[in-house]
């Protein structure tokens, strides 16, 4: 019996070492060499080097002086990240969207962009379409006492245009740049 068990245990040990130790170390080493920023979480730091967040995870910004991220079904907690799973016919979804739209609505700006009232699939989407960021520019400029053109230029300079897919604005990076502006 041990004769039959020995090759199985040896295979288990070898495969465990290869797949559980060697392969992860190899992939981590290659990632650190080829993509160090991404391998370490795409962290955004302030001037002193303090980590403020990741380019990959949304944060909640309250107050009129900040650009707001998309709503989060999990209150921006990475542990409970998820979509709301509410059906389009669910009255609770309609109520939440109406409440969020009322909070985001800016007079004479037209309808609130969909991205500002709907959650993303993960509930932690860090990006907005440029039109959703531009929609908030007037509110942010007014609250901060800044010229609207300056805030609009800031949105434009933080608009990322990937090779494939729509243009996006990272809300955390935009708010960090906004915090660095002189009032």
Curated annotation (Swiss-Prot):
It comes from Pseudomonas aeruginosa (strain ATCC 15692 / DSM 22644 / CIP 104116 / JCM 14847 / LMG 12228 / 1C / PRS 101 / PAO1). Belongs to the KdpC family. This is Potassium-transporting ATPase KdpC subunit. The gene is kdpC. One of its GO terms (molecular function) is P-type potassium transmembrane transporter activity. One of its GO terms (cellular component) is plasma membrane. It is a single-pass membrane protein. The system is composed of three essential subunits: KdpA, KdpB and KdpC. Keywords: ATP-binding, Cell inner membrane, Cell membrane, Ion transport, Membrane, Nucleotide-binding, Potassium, Potassium transport, Transmembrane, Transmembrane helix, Transport. One of its GO terms (biological process) is potassium ion transmembrane transport. Part of the high-affinity ATP-driven potassium transport (or Kdp) system, which catalyzes the hydrolysis of ATP coupled with the electrogenic transport of potassium into the cytoplasm. This subunit acts as a catalytic chaperone that increases the ATP-binding affinity of the ATP-hydrolyzing subunit KdpB by the formation of a transient KdpB/KdpC/ATP ternary complex. It comes from the Bacteria.
């Amino acid at each position: 019996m041990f004769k039959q068990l020995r090759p199985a245990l040896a295979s288990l040990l070898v495969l465990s070492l290869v797949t559980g130790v060697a392969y992860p170390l190899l992939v981590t080493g290659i990632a650190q060499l080829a993509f160090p920023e991404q391998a370490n979480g795409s962290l955004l730091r302030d001037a002193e080097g303090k980590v403020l967040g990741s380019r990959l995870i949304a944060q909640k910004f309250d107050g009129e002086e900040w650009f707001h991220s998309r709503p989060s079904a999990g209150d921006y907690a990475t542990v409970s990240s998820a979509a709301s799973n509410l059906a389009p016919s669910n009255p609770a979804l309609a109520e939440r969207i109406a409440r969020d739209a009322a909070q985001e609505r800016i007079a004479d700006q037209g309808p609130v962009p969909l991205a500002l009232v709907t959650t993303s699939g993960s509930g932690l989407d860090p990006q907005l379409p440029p039109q959703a960021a531009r929609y908030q520019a007037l509110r942010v400029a007014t609250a901060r006492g800044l010229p609207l053109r300056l805030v609009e230029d800031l949105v434009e300079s933080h608009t990322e245009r990937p090779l494939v897919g729509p243009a996006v604005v990272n809300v955390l990076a935009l708010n960090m740049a906004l915090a660095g502006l002189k009032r």
